[in-house]
Amino acid sequence: ALSLGGQQWNNLSVVSAPSLNGTKIEAQGREVNATLLMRNHAPWLANIKYLYYNPGVAKTHASSPTPTSPLASANTISFRGWPDLQLRCEECWLWGQKYGRIDGDFAIKGNTLTLANGLIDTGFARLKANGEWVNAPGNERTSLKGSLHGSNLDTAAGFFGISTPIQNASFNVDYDLHWRNPPWQPEEATLNGILRTRLGKGEFTDLSSGHAGQLLRLLSFDALLRKLRFDFRDTFSEGFYFDSIHSTAWIKDGVLHTDDTL
C-alpha cells in the first residue's frame, strides 16, 4: 500500500504513457479508478470513475501523526506551477461521505484560482457553483455564486445525516456569497451576500405544542385555500402544511437579514 495525502492507497497500480499531446496516467486500486491527461498546451483533464478519499483514517505512529486534512497547512499554499484542470468525478467519497458526481473547471492566473461549471450532484440535490479564491498574502478572499436545488428537502438533508422540520418540499436556493480567508475557512465577520430561497409544497413538523402551531394552521392563507378545496390535512394533523415559501435574505458582516419571507 502507498501512503499519500494522509491515506493508505491499497492494491494501487499506476501506469504512465506518452499521449498525442502530453502524458496519460492511469491509476487503479481499491480507493481510486481514474485517468489523468497531462496535456501540453491545454488544461489537464482528470476523469475519475471512483474515488474514496478519507485522510486521517490510516494508522500512523504517534511520533509522526498524519494531518486529518491536506488543507491543514493552507497558509503555505502557492499556485505557482499549478496547471489549469478540468475535473470530472462520477462517484466521489470524501472524508467518509458520499458526494456522488463532482465536476469543476479550475483556472490559475497569478494568485487567483477560478472555478467554473462547478457541480455536486448527490442524486438528491444539485449544487452548482462558480467563483474564485484570491490567495494573495494578507488579502485572501473567496467568492462563490450559484444555486442549490432538489425535489425533497428532508431527503436531501438526510443524505448528509441532517434532520430538518421541513418535510416533502422541493427547494431552490440561489446564492451569491463572499468572505475573507480560504474557501474552507470562512471568516464569519466578513461573510456578505444574498440568498434567495423558494420552497414548494410541504409541511412543517413538530408544531404540535402550544398555541402557535394551532394559530398557524387556522389562519394561514394557504390553509384557508386548502379548506376551500376540501383538503383538511392540517386541521387534523400536528404539522403545518404550506403551498410555497419564498424568501430573500442578505448577509451583512455575518448577520442574516430578511423582511419578505412569505
For every predicted segment, state its role.
Residues 149-153:
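Short connector loops/turns at beta-strand edges and beta->alpha or beta->beta junctions
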Residues 1-32, 63-147, 168-262:
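Solvent-exposed beta-strand/coil patches in large extracellular/periplasmic or lumenal scaffold regions
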Residues 156-158:
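Extended non-catalytic domains of envelope/secretory-pathway proteins
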Residues 52-63:
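Soluble, acidic/polar mature domains that operate outside membranes
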Residues 162:
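Cytosolic ligand/metal-binding cores
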